[in-house]
Amino acid sequence: MASEVLVKPQMRGLLARRLRIHMVGAFLVSLGVAALYKFGVAEPRKKAYADFYKNYSAEKDFEEMKKAGLFRSIK
């Protein structure tokens, strides 16, 4: 047993190796979150705005508010 050589543990570069691994993981997670936000929130919102303004008439909306009496300066 005394003739067997024990393998020394790696003592240098442990922090650098862990940081590299965690930075890659954090980068991948941030890309995933950005993609989920874009396709889960931003694109549906953009589509909803486009659908609303496709048939929106400002004059018609103005006339409805005028008939409802929301403007004091217009009679």
Swiss-Prot record:
Gene Ontology terms: cellular component: mitochondrial inner membrane
Gene3D superfamilies xrefs: Mitochondrial cytochrome c oxidase subunit VIc/VIIs
Keyword Membrane: yes
Membrane disposition: Single-pass membrane protein
Natural source organism: Plecturocebus donacophilus (Bolivian gray titi monkey)
Disulfide bonds: none
Sorted UniProt keywords: Membrane, Mitochondrion, Mitochondrion inner membrane, Transmembrane, Transmembrane helix
Lineage of source species: Eukaryota, Metazoa, Chordata, Craniata, Vertebrata
Pathway: Energy metabolism; oxidative phosphorylation
The protein, known as: Cytochrome c oxidase subunit 6C
Purpose of the protein: Component of the cytochrome c oxidase, the last enzyme in the mitochondrial electron transport chain which drives oxidative phosphorylation. The respiratory chain contains 3 multisubunit complexes succinate dehydrogenase (complex II, CII), ubiquinol-cytochrome c oxidoreductase (cytochrome b-c1 complex, complex III, CIII) and cytochrome c oxidase (complex IV, CIV), that cooperate to transfer electrons derived from NADH and succinate to molecular oxygen, creating an electrochemical gradient over the inner membrane that drives transmembrane transport and the ATP synthase.
Main location, first listed in the record: mitochondrion
Subcellular location: Mitochondrion inner membrane
Mitochondrial intermembrane side of membrane: 55-75
Transmembrane segments annotated in the record for this chain: 14-54
Mitochondrial matrix side: 1-13
